[in-house]
């Protein structure tokens, strides 16, 4: 139904919307792993994503999404907005996976990088691996050094933008 409604919202005729829905879904769902699935999921989520982006913008929160993974981040506490965020998502027909939903306010880790005091850093275990160069091949050691340098550069650039 959501895929069909999305095609209708993009001004496809009901017949074409029905055909496209049949071509891009399996047993009423967007199939995981199909070449079209990411595109369809993003198109279906556009309206909801725009609402969430507008809310985030109003409160100076960074909002990112990749298919069904949503991240909200800010240097300020926005716990009071969580019910509104959940309402927007559910009102648009999506189901929240409460097992995968969490609010983290102290040193959040996003894709393995730690955010602390508006700065990015690599986790302690990463630094220990880097210091224990004997357990790594020279190529691995150089790769880890370059990764840490990249995180440090991004963090420094972000800090300069805050000044």
Regions found by a protein language model. Name each.
Residues 33, 37, 58-74:
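Catalytic palm active-site di-aspartate
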Residues 1-34, 43-54, 75-163:
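Right-hand nucleic-acid polymerase module
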């Amino acid at each position: 139904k959501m895929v069909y409604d999305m095609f209708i919202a993009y001004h496809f005729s009901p017949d074409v919307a029905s055909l496209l829905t049949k071509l891009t879904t399996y047993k009423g769902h967007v199939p995981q792993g199909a070449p079209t699935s990411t595109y369809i999921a993003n198109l279906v989520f556009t309206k909801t994503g725009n609402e969430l982006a507008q809310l985030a913008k109003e409160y100076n929160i960074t909002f990112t999404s990749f298919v069904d993974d949503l991240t909200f981040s800010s240097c300020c506490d926005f716990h009071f907005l969580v019910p509104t965020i959940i309402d927007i998502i559910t009102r648009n027909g999506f189901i929240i996976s409460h097992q995968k939903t969490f609010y983290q306010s102290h040193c959040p880790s996003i894709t393995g990088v730690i955010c602390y005091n508006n700065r990015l850093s690599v986790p302690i275990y990463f630094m220990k691996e880097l210091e224990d160069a004997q357990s790594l091949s020279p190529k691995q050691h150089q790769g880890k050094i370059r990764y840490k340098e990249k995180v440090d550069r991004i963090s420094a650039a972000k800090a300069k933008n805050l000044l």
